[in-house]
Amino acid sequence: MNDVYIIGGLRSYIGVYNGMYRHVPAEKLGAAVLQEVICAYGLVRIDEIIGGNSVGCGGNITRLAALEAGLDVSVPAVTVDMQCCSGLESIAIAAAKVASGQAECILAGGFDSASTQPRRSCHPNHPAYRGDENWYMTAQFCPQVWSEDCMLRCAEYTAEQFQITREMLDAWVLRSHALAGEAVREGVFQPCIAPVWGGARDEGIRPAMRPQLLRRLKPVLPDGTVITAANACLTNDGAAFVIVCSPAYARRYGLQPAVKIRGVVSCGTDPLLSPVGAVQAAEAVLTRCGLRGEDIDIFEINEAFALIGELFARQFPRCVAAYNPFGGALAYGHPYGATGAVLLLHAIEGLRARDGALGCCSIAGAGGLGKAMIIERV
């Protein structure tokens, strides 16, 4: 099997729901970043586009984004839905195609827009039909639960099962925003940001977040105790793509790889404990690669909920300093289908900033899923 390189890539600034991208459909946001990546790296031949998308309109929206971006009609495109894991799964699929010789260069990543997310309704034939005006935004992820707040309930249940307190969670919130604010001041991620559609900053970062503010917040669920609007990430708009290619392609076109992919893992867990998937996947990919947590210089773990940080610290107590050292999704946000590529780009830039060698990206997905990838700086 061939080695697989990531040359680099770009992400948009990440917008909050009804924020700076509120009138930008997901495919147009994705198209803009695709255009920027192609231009920035001078790509002349692309075999395929693979994009993750979780809450879009369906209908192979990645193909629509590719056509919006002006790619030649001969370049195929496919959309991946593994919910929050979609972007990282898209990159993993691209890597497998390159490793097996099916392709030499693929743009992979994803995009989503919470601001323009379609409302859906059950067909009258469906057992859950309750009338034409009974709209829903959240799909069903497990047989036991189907509600708009199911992920929040899973987070509450996970916190209860692992005896995680609100004070523990709020400490991770403060850490994430403080580190993200510092990263912005130092311009750590500026090289991987494409200021498309007028974006000028990541809208969710609050470096001045204070404990007093967090203590005033009420739980988001009427019967909840620990999950608040601060220790659960926001809903967001964003796009990110990376260049996945073979060593031969990189040599032929004079492209300098940033990292190579060392290993990839998918896993499943209890859907009602879905946040556990991020840590479980990280453990699994370390085992597959014959590594220990202490071997990793940067863990980019999607903190859809602050409790993921607490779960990580309990499983990897000696690696806390390497966990999201420039802040995580509690600050930057979580544009579902794009997040896997955002994690990878942050890991690449973070390794450069810290002169590190190995990075681990991991993410949990709705329905009890986990996806993780280990990269090595070239």
Show which residues each predicted segment covers:
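Condensing-enzyme catalytic core mediating Claisen C-C bond formation in acyl metabolism
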Residues: 1-26, 212-276, 280-283, 288, ...
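Conserved beta-ketoacyl condensing-enzyme motif
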Residues: 22-85, 89-98, 103-105, 111-125, ...
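Short, well-ordered amphipathic alpha-helical segments that serve as non-catalytic structural scaffolds
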Residues: 26-41, 61-65, 90, 151-158, ...
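Active-site-proximal alpha-helical scaffold in enzymes
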Residues: 82-112, 159-189, 242-248, 335-356, ...
